[in-house]
Amino acid sequence: MKKVRKTCAFTGHRPKKLPWGYNETDVRCVAMKVALERQIRSLVQEGVTDFLSGMAEGIDLLAAEIVLNLRAEYPCIKLHCILPYKGQETEWSAASQARYHAILAQADSIIYVSRIFRKNCMLERNHFLAAHSDVLLAVYNGEYRGGTAATIRYAQKLGHSVIILDPTK
């Protein structure tokens, strides 16, 4: 009998909504990275083997890098990149684009929700993440509006477990 794989998806804010912005040396960002790694380790110990990242700037990229770094210790874990459309990174800085491509090069799979940009492709990506996970790990500041909030509500509507880390604390 084939063993069922448990899946965790990530959702979280982009840098403009994070207290540290793009400054990953800020103590609040360092603390969030530690909290994310601790939570990911805990999920692996609970049997989660597959991690889904939407690969947006901010929390998605941070979480994806943590999963990749933990693969040396936990070779059973997989990173699946769920992209809203081909070329989502083209308007980003050169450094962010390089980071994005480095993660994609190490991913176990890449899934495009759409090949081209469409009005709802980000929402569709977020719904895909929630629908294809057992657990949603969210870095969320409590604002009602926005993609992170909508993804959390959708996962809850589906009856999935949601773990929230607050970037303001």
Q: Where are each of the predicted segments found?
A:
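Acidic/glycine-enriched connector segments
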Residues: 1-169
